């Protein structure tokens, strides 16, 4: 079981490191289309302070986890003063007898004005194999990688040796 946990963490970290250079997932691969859909949807939500879109993004991601087979009681959207947090538990079999691991990311971005950008900051644009838009790297890419990774592992029937907890803040 240690090997599968190590493999999961290694692959997740590898994806995050490689994706910081260029996000060019083959959308024809299994889960590639779903990952791209989540990425595009999240970049195109203006989750800046005062825009009240973080709760919308949290609810969208919660619905993806529900569709992906995560029990409703393990998915929590916590709305607080115009923003939100999302907490998702991936239940393990406790074969490792260890405490849960928390994986965190943030759903919000610093606001951007259209006139300050060459492109609309809240429209995902691909040019020459690179994606442009507010949050494409920090941190909607990481959030998408974790989300898509959990969805894929769940679909493949993988059960972690301990609980894994997603904690996305707004």
Give the ranges of each region predicted by the language model.
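Bacterial N-terminal signal peptides that target proteins for export
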Residues: 1-10
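Basic/polar N-terminal segments that are highly enriched at the extreme N-terminus
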Residues: 1-2, 21-30
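Residue-level micro-sites within transmembrane alpha helices that shape
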Residues: 6, 137-139
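Bacterial N-terminal signal peptides
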Residues: 9-20
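Acidic/His- and Gly-rich active-site-bordering loop/insert found
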Residues: 26-136, 143, 152-163, 170
